[in-house]
């Protein structure tokens, strides 16, 4: 009986450790969780941070530096929505964010709708920057040269491994899009967010386009180059859109591809073999 009890205790110990790791902890104004001996930043107490004299009396834009360690654990990941303006992130006052060296991973929604960020400094240690990470963020990106996976030039943040455009900073407006193979989810949301009168010239190298690339913008006409084989659900959600030229290379128009678009006419290429559910909702 005692032997069985010890076996059960030993089996439950890892579960107890996992439960403790999953608990939210706090270090100053920062909330975090522990996984494999490393800290994941999960949130900030913005009220406490703004009450701190260091921030209260600083001239905008305030510089917010994320610590390299929390509770003695190295910060290697930042979760989703941490800097979202809709979740309490400082509003009505511009601020800059400096992420620490040693950070390896950002979440797909880390900076979603962080409307008042003016500059984000990324560390050279970053290994994972997912699509959609900087959805509708009007910030410039400061990223060291030499990262083997990512680069940022002329305001364009690119995954060099997959040749995917991840982000377009405000300074990129008016500059030709880089020769990439894919426009990632939300990658052009800032390209048009403040400039609704700009119709894009897409690179000839383009093969696929992610979701929400043309979202809630004033773009009226889009011409896709030959070589495009893939669009995504919600690639378009743009009531101003009037004209789209699809290439002969396209094979499918996925579900919800032209969501809430008021096109007057559209020619479907002969090579398209599937049109998804509600692909032209609002047509």
PLM-predicted stretches and their roles:
Residues 1-5:
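Positively charged n-region of N-terminal signal peptides that target proteins for export
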Residues 6-19:
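Hydrophobic h-region of N-terminal signal peptides that target proteins for export
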Residues 13, 57-58, 133-135, 236-237, ...:
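Alpha-helix C-terminal capping segments
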Residues 20-55, 153-156, 160:
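Short beta-strand/loop segment at the start of cytosolic alpha/beta domains
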Residues 36-38, 58-76, 88-105, 114-128, ...:
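Structural signature of tandem-repeat unit edges
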Residues 56, 82-87:
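Acidic, Ser/Thr
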Residues 80-82, 108-110, 131-133, 186-187, ...:
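Consensus positions within tandem repeat domains that build extended binding/scaffold surfaces
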């Amino acid at each position: 009986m005692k032997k069985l009890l010890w076996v059960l205790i030993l089996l439950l110990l890892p579960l107890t450790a996992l439960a403790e790791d999953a608990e939210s902890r706090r270090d100053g104004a920062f909330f975090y969780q522990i996984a494999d001996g490393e800290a994941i930043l999960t949130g900030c107490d913005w009220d406490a941070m703004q009450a701190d004299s260091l921030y209260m009396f600083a001239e905008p834009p305030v510089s917010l530096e994320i610590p390299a360690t929390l509770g003695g654990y190295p910060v290697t990941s930042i979760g989703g929505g941490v800097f979202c303006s809709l979740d309490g992130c400082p509003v009505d006052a511009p601020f800059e964010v400096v992420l620490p060296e040693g950070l390896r991973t950002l979440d797909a929604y880390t900076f979603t709708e962080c409307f008042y960020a003016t500059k984000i400094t990324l560390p050279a240690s970053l290994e994972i920057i997912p699509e959609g990470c900087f959805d509708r963020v009007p910030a410039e990106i400061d990223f060291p040269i030499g990262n083997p996976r990512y680069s940022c030039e002329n305001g364009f943040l690119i995954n060099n491994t997959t040749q995917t455009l991840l982000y377009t900073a405000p300074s990129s407006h008016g500059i030709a899009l880089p020769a990439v193979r894919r426009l990632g989810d939300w990658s052009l949301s800032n390209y048009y967010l403040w400039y609704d009168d700009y119709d894009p010239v897409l690179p000839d190298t383009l093969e696929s386009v992610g979701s929400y690339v043309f979202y809630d913008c004033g773009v009226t006409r889009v011409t896709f180059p030959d070589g495009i084989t893939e669009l995504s659900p919600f690639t378009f959600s743009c009531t101003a859109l009037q004209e789209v030229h699809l290439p002969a290379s396209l094979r499918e128009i996925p579900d919800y591809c032209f969501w809430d678009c008021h096109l007057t006419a559209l020619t479907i290429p002969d090579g398209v073999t599937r049109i998804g559910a509600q692909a032209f909702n609002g047509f």
